[in-house]
Every structure is written in C-alpha cells, then in structure tokens.
Amino acid sequence: MSKLWRRGSTSGAMEAPEPGEALELSLAGAHGHGVHKKKHKKHKKKHKKKHHQEEDAGPTQPSPAKPQLKLKIKLGGQVLGTKSVPTFTVIPEGPRSPSPLMVVDNEEEPMEGVPLEQYRAWLDEDSNLSPSPLRDLSGGLGGQEEEEEQRWLDALEKGELDDNGDLKKEINERLLTARQRALLQKARSQPSPMLPLPVAEGCPPPALTEEMLLKREERARKRRLQAARRAEEHKNQTIERLTKTAATSGRGGRGGARGERRGGRAAAPAPMVRYCSGAQGSTLSFPPGVPAPTAVSQRPSPSGPPPRCSVPGCPHPRRYACSRTGQALCSLQCYRINLQMRLGGPEGPGSPLLAT
C-alpha cells in the first residue's frame, strides 16, 4: 500500500527520520505494492525555523506514543485477521540510493521508531492467527467439481447421459402444465420399447445353402440388368434432347421438331368452322373440301290476319283465352259478356254492354 520516506536534500541518500517525521507501512506496502501520492508541504518556512531550533536545542525527551494502529486484512469481503500495531518509523541500516517511492509526510508529529524486523515478526504473527478462508473456499470448490465428475462417470457407465453427453436434469413437475405432466407420467409408466441388441462375439456366420446362393445370384443379375436399362434410357434421353435442340435451331420452330419426330413432315392443321354474328346477320363458314350441311328449314310465317276477340261486335285482337269456354278474348268486359252468352244470364245478346 504505502511507504512514507523522507527525500534526501542534496546527496540523494536515505537519512534517518528525525523526531517529528513519520513513516507508516501497511500490509500491502510490506510486500511492495501500491504507492501513495506525494503530499503537499505545509508551513514550509515555519518548519525550517523549527528544524533549526531543534538542532540548536539538542536532543530532547521523546513525546508520549500515539495510539496504536489497527491492521485489518480483508479478502473477498471476509476479514482474515486483525492486529494492533503501534505507529513507528523505519530505521535504515545505511545509506541507500534514492528511490522513486519517497513521499514526504507531515513532519510535525513525532513518532517512535520500530525496527523493520519487528514489524515483519508482527505480520508473521497475524498470518498465524487465523487461517485464510480462501483455502476452504478453494477446497470446497474442488470437492464439488470432483463430486460432479464422479456423478458424470457413474451416469456414463449406466448410460443415463442425454444426447449432448450431459447429465440429465431433474424435471420439476410443478412447473409443467397438466398435459406435459400427463405425458411425462405416461412415458415413465410405459417400458422402453428399445431393447439392447445381443452382441455375438466370435459366432461363425450361418452356412449358406445352394438355394440361398442361387437367390443371391438372381438378385445380383437383376440389379445389373436394371443398371444397364437405366444407363440406356439416360443415353436415349440425352440423344433425343440434343436432336431436338439441333432441329429447333435448324428449322426455326417447334412445329418442325414435332413434325420430324412424327415422320419427317409437319402435320396439316385441323379443319375449323367459323361462326360470326353481327348486325347484318350471322354467318357460318366452312373450310374448302368440307361439305356444308343441308339448309335449315325456315319456319313458315303465319298467314292471314291475327285472330280477334270472339265476342260479337268486338274489333280488338285476341289477347288471351277464356279459362272456362276457351274463347278468344281481349278484356275483362268481353270476358263477362262471353260468360253471359255461353253460360246464360239475366242479360242476353241485346245487352247494352255490347254497344260499349
């Protein structure tokens, strides 16, 4: 973590800390990790005056010791050990080369000196107080891995691994639907249809009889014939495709290729009958050489004037027939007159209705 040193003035050598100068070592600093930033000097002029006064006055009695420091070691959020260590200064054994790890601390607080060997002894005591829980954690993880590997080996021997070669996971039935739960219970209740095949070790092959040999030769001969037939068909299709392409490019049309396939000439078009209907009338055309059908007999036109109403004296043409007498009538009035005349009624032929 941090080492606090006092930088040499001119020669760059390490000097022993004077009273009022402190050097503090933490656990990580003892191992050489991490460095604090250089602190700002405070009251520089006053400090120089005080320093000269102390040199003139000579050695004085050391001030009472400050409260001890408490070192706490944490790894992974767990406290590994706690040790109370008094603040101290490092007494160098001799002059050394200047180090970049020299930071000036507040020099106004006097500290008592502690040898570095004593501090290392304290660190050793802290390491012996409580064992590191990381060993237990690593041991626990190793035990879990060994247990899982053993379970995997057991499942491999029993053939209980899944398709991916992993251990089969236990299915929580509470997370399944009713249909999935029913299918799972059905699969568990029914025995597996797959049975292990018997492995024949060192068994001689069955002896082949003469009939079996003949059947085998017959099957081989049929396979050879089918292969030759397929090769011949493939060759014919290739020849036909090439011939068709050449005929199409030489004669310039599908008709030429079709005629050449059929007999070397194009087929004549089939005779067609054409029917046209227009405002001037309807026509029916036949190709040459095809006899036309006989003329359709025309419907005779009605001769004579149209029939008139059967009521005497009525000049109107017939519009409908009477449902009772069957006579031609033209209106409702003629219908009534016809009923009176044919069926009898109070009014005779001289009725005034006839005049109208």
UniProtKB/Swiss-Prot annotation:
A zinc finger (HIT-type) spans 305-336. Residues 213-245 form a coiled coil. InterPro entries: INO80B/Ies2, INO80B_C, Znf_HIT. One of its GO terms (biological process) is positive regulation of DNA repair. It is found in: Nucleus; Nucleus, Nucleolus. Residues 1-71, 124-150, 246-269, 286-310 are annotated as: Disordered. One of its GO terms (cellular component) is nucleolus. Pfam families: PAPA-1, zf-HIT. The keyword Metal-binding applies. CDD domains: zf-HIT_IN80B. Residues 33-51 have a biased composition (Basic residues). The keyword DNA damage applies. One of its GO terms (molecular function) is zinc ion binding. Keywords: Coiled coil, DNA damage, DNA recombination, DNA repair, Metal-binding, Nucleus, Phosphoprotein, Transcription, Transcription regulation, Zinc, Zinc-finger. The modification Phosphoserine is found at S97, S99, S127, S130, S132. Component of the chromatin remodeling INO80 complex; specifically part of a complex module associated with the helicase ATP-binding and the helicase C-terminal domain of INO80. Interacts with RP9. Induces growth and cell cycle arrests at the G1 phase of the cell cycle. This is INO80 complex subunit B. It comes from Homo sapiens. The lineage of its organism: Eukaryota, Metazoa, Chordata, Craniata, Vertebrata.
